[in-house]
Every structure is written in C-alpha cells, then in structure tokens.
C-alpha cells in the first residue's frame, strides 16, 4: 500500500511539506482555518493546485477585472470553458486561447500538442463544433541550435495534433527575440460554431444526479502541471518532464464526436474538460458554480497505472478526459453512447446539496473540503507595482531615425528577418484545408472560415507586438488590440470580441506587475473604443529563465464576422492599373521596430503611438468601403513599415508590381512603424467613390512589370526591387536559417 508513505497532517505542517507543493505559510494557515483542522496529504494537494496562479488567478484577478467583458453580442463571458458571441441566425461563435509555455520549454512536441488538445476540449465542452485553430508562438533567435530544436518540435507538435484530429490550423503568428530563448511561448486558440440552444455549462446541478468520467484513462502524467506552470523555469525544470502530458489526437477526435452527440441528449446536465488540475478543478468548479457539492468514488476512476493514490488521481493531468453530470437513472444511455465510439463512460459519484467535495477510496473518506473553498476562495493578492526602471529613460529619448545607406538592401534584409519573413515553412506542415471551409488560407492579414449553410464567414487572427509593449506597456497594449482589429477589417470582417493570453514574467517582481497592469489598461481602453469585449482568456506568469523575463506578451486572439463572403478581401494586389492608396500618416517612429532591432541588435526609445479614436474611424471607413465593393486588396502596415507592406502585397500576387511615390524623409517613409495605416488598392473606375468614402492618399498604381519601384516626392527613385527576387528572399529566410 503506497498510502503508508504519505506524510500525516502533523508532518505536513511541521516539515512544511505544503511549501514544496506551492502553498505559502499564510495560505496553509488559511486552509487550516477553513477546515477547522490540519489537512491530510490529499487535501493539501487539492488546495495547492486549485490555489496556484494557473487555476486561481490569485495574482492577476484585480487586474483582469479591468477588462470590459459585456456587449450586445456576448452570450458567455469569462468563467466558463470558452466565451461565446452571437453571430445572428441563432448561431454563435465560441473561442478561447490558452498558453502551454512551460511544458513546451522542456518537452516541445508534447507540450505544444497537448496545448492544442486542451483548447479544443474547452471549446467542445461548451457544446460547439471546433472549426479552426490558430496559434501565437515566440522563440529565441534561430541561430541557436536549442531554439531551432524547440521551433521545429513545437510546430511539429501543433501540426501532429491538429492534422490528426481534422481541425484546420488556419492562422497565427511567429516572432523571434533573444528574450524567449530559454522560455518559448506557445499560445493556442480554437474557434467553434454552435446553435444557441446547444450551449452547455460546466455546472453540477440537481442533488442526486450522477457524476460520470468519460474519455481516456488516468495515469501519472501531468501531476502538478498547474503548479509547475506557476513557477519560474530553471535548470531543474528538465527533471519535470513527467509534468508534461502526452496527447492522443485520435482519442480526442472520438471524444469530440461523442460529446457533440451527448449534447443533443436531455440526459446531460453539465460538462467540463479535465484540464489544469484534472479531476480536482473539474469537480470543484462544477460543484461550486452550481452551489452544490460532489461525492466521488476514486476506485471507479479508469486507471492505466497500478497503485495510484487519491492524490495522484486527483492531480493527474492526463489528456482527453471530461467530467459530466447526467440525470439520475439515465446513466446506461450515456455508457451506450460512448461505447459506440469505443470510449469509456464510468459512474464515479453524485451531486450533493451540502457544497462539500468528498472523496472516497478503498472504503474510506480520503478528503472532505468545501467546493467553494477550492474554486472561489483562493486568496487574492494585490501585488506591489513599480514603474520599470528603463521606462522613463526610454520615454525621454529623442527618437532618432536610423541611418540607412542603401534602401533596396535594407528592404531585402528586412524581408529576411524571421519575424517578417514568410512562415510558409510553418503552415505548410498544417492541414489548413481539412473540413473544406477555409476561404482565406494562412499568409494574409486574417484567416477566414465559411459558416456552413450561410453566406457568412468568420475572420480570425492572433496579434501582439511584444517589443512595443516592453517599451511602453500601456501604448503597446492598445496597439495589440488595434492591430488585431485592423487585420480583421482588412479581411472584410467586423471585429466582434477578443480572447487574450497574458504571458509575463514573475508577478512577484514589482516591475513585472507594473507591465501587467499597464498593458491591461491599454488593452481595456482599446477594447472599449473598438467595441471588442474580452470573453475569456488565460494568464501565464513566471515566464523567466535564470531570472530573465520574456518581453511582456499579452497576445490578442480576435474573431470578426464577415457578413457576406463576397466581402472577403486579401492583401495581395489583384490587377495591373489598380490605384494604390495609403491611409494614415507616417511619423519617424522606430522604437521597437524591425529596422531598429536589425541595425542595433536591441530595442530602445518610445514605442509608436496610437490614437484609438482615429484608429476606429479609419477601420470603419475601410470596412464600409470593402462592404461597398470598392476595394481590391487591403493590407495593414505593421513590422517593417510601408516598404514591407507594399512588397508583401506584390509578393502574394503573380507577376504584378507597383510604382509608388512616398512623401517625407525617405527612411521613415519606407520603414517607420507608425500605427493605424493601411495599403489599399482600388479599381480605377471606383476612384471617386472610394475617395469620397475614405480619407486616403493615392500614392501610385499596380503594374505588370513584376517590380516594386518607390520614389520620393522629388520623383527620385529610392529603390527598385524585382518581385521574384523579393519572394525568393522572403520565402527562403526561415528554411535557410534552419539548415
């Protein structure tokens, strides 16, 4: 009997065993007070994992409350598996993004794969069919062999899981900066579709109803994964490989189909994914949200390893498992349904009225804890916040324009920067056409997926320029949301809502907490102005290696509604003779830019600035022009500035180029990263109508010369670049670095 080895309650207290599990002295004293006695080993484990930052948001809740979370289309905000937004005709879109950073740092293939699996379960546990996946990835520089290994394995893991399960990976972003070398970021997003009447909640209602366990069996993988995600990575992290779970996408495919059939049955009361903290979080949260209790008999848990203790079963994060509550007396229907898919469905407990979570094993009660205490009563910490030392210094710097000798060489060098370069090497490994609903494939501003049976589409994107946020968290936070919305608009979509993944360093450091606060302030303001509420998300703290934090990276996942698929617009030029317009003014803004990083090897100074009211006005004008059929192509101006944006629009086309004239100082005109700018092409016959509808400046026209030529206001040629050569450089950059 392995139970003999577990320390008794007195030992747990005297030897401070709780501290190894992640509880502080004060927290352990709180547990003692809640229970009116010392907790046993299993109970200490339950509290340690439910009160971790990963599950309780105890360090970030005061900040998260600033987000606007309601709107006329919002059907479900934060608090359930995923958020839900109405898209009309009794349909809704369900989406969420989550991080799997720490597991991916030590076991990149499985870490990334199970990140994808977990976020898919969050979406179908709401009753939705998953229709698309996206991701947002950060790595160190590709010159490092370790980074190459992480990059290749993470991409393979995402591809391996998504392709097997048959959900298209349609978009995302990959950025490279030295600060991510020891701590990559892997954020996965899933989007699903649902009819209003099918929406399910993770709630355990109805005393006497049956608690069932469905899906894969439980092993020792991932024990304390949530706690592991709530501490900094160190050399000893390698030893925590067992805390990384192993995914089985074929099992999950069956689980999706079984659960979507289950949702049509009136026998189902509630359903929740066993994610972080496994059985503990699913049971405690479902009971707490319903104001009920749950009793569970752990001998009935399907186990794939022998001699598992209650502690191990409750804290395992084995994948592809769900906890469901069904009406009493209807259990056999559920067993039969899951059996049809070759899956186990086992009765393992019941709903009670007294709000307690009780666990039984081998005939004895092994834990008795108030469900609310686990799910709702974690301490909330108002961490000290202090402006980062570098901030004032950066703010006071006069922004100098970098010295550029040769504009053409600089453009080619920028196109080969891994953050700008083609990500085809990445997305060619993903099946982005499975389910045959993908209208706009990876590589344009946003992906678009058809809403079957309608003329509508969903536009989706992930965005975050972490460098801007490092330089100025509040301004950068605004830009992250605005850029996501700009990408949706350029694709013909109306921005609906966002999910976020807040990736930061250690919140116990006041300067890091300041970054969190300020970036959330900026994001919240942008969400209010652009009317894109936050409907759910995830916080990932402690992204540090050897005390060095990553850049603050609050990734934005946004979904927009394309009201009619004929509005779908992409970034590449369409035909020679079309007029090229630029919307928005260019300033000499180079802080955090690709050019600054490339020339100086570091970033400094002020980030670009943004006026959210101006941003909103421009987005509305562009979207109206697209919906009126006046726009041929649209592309947001981001990393690398106008020269890169115009080149990308040419690279995506076949045999087309452009002749363009840009005013102002040449380096800024070409490469500055000022916000709220678009490159738009318009048919000549629509010139008047377009200029009436949109404040834009005509800068040139699309040609069939296969060259991009840019002049200054004196009509001197700044650069002429062959589009085939640019395409070759842009497409070859990442494969070349990986060789």
Swiss-Prot record:
UniProt entry tagged with the keyword Cell membrane: no
The entry's ATP-binding residues are: 57, 96, 500, 537
Q: Which GO terms describe its molecular function?
A: ATP binding; magnesium ion binding; phosphoribosylformylglycinamidine synthase activity
Which sites bind substrate? 99-102, 121, 245, 317-319, 540
SUPFAM superfamilies associated with the record:
PurM C-terminal domain-like (SSF56042), PurM N-terminal domain-like (SSF55326)
E.C. numbers: 6.3.5.3
Q: Where does Mg(2+) 1 bind?
A: 98, 538
The UniProt keyword set, sorted, is: ATP-binding, Cytoplasm, Ligase, Magnesium, Metal-binding, Nucleotide-binding, Purine biosynthesis
Source domain of life is: Bacteria
GO CC annotation, single: cytoplasm
Name the top EC class. Answer: ligase
* Predominant location category: cytoplasm
Indicate the residues that form the catalytic site: 54, 100 (proton acceptor)
Could you tell me which pathway this protein works in? Purine metabolism; IMP biosynthesis via de novo pathway; 5-amino-1-(5-phospho-D-ribosyl)imidazole from N(2)-formyl-N(1)-(5-phospho-D-ribosyl)glycinamide: step 1/2
Q: Where in the cell is it found?
A: Cytoplasm
What this chain does, per the entry, is described as: Part of the phosphoribosylformylglycinamidine synthase complex involved in the purines biosynthetic pathway. Catalyzes the ATP-dependent conversion of formylglycinamide ribonucleotide (FGAR) and glutamine to yield formylglycinamidine ribonucleotide (FGAM) and glutamate. The FGAM synthase complex is composed of three subunits. PurQ produces an ammonia molecule by converting glutamine to glutamate. PurL transfers the ammonia molecule to FGAR to form FGAM in an ATP-dependent manner.
User: To which protein family does this belong?
Assistant: Belongs to the FGAMS family.
Q: How does it assemble?
A: Monomer. Part of the FGAM synthase complex composed of 1 PurL, 1 PurQ and 2 PurS subunits.
Can you name this protein? Phosphoribosylformylglycinamidine synthase subunit PurL
Q: Which organism is it from?
A: Bacillus cereus (strain ATCC 10987 / NRS 248)
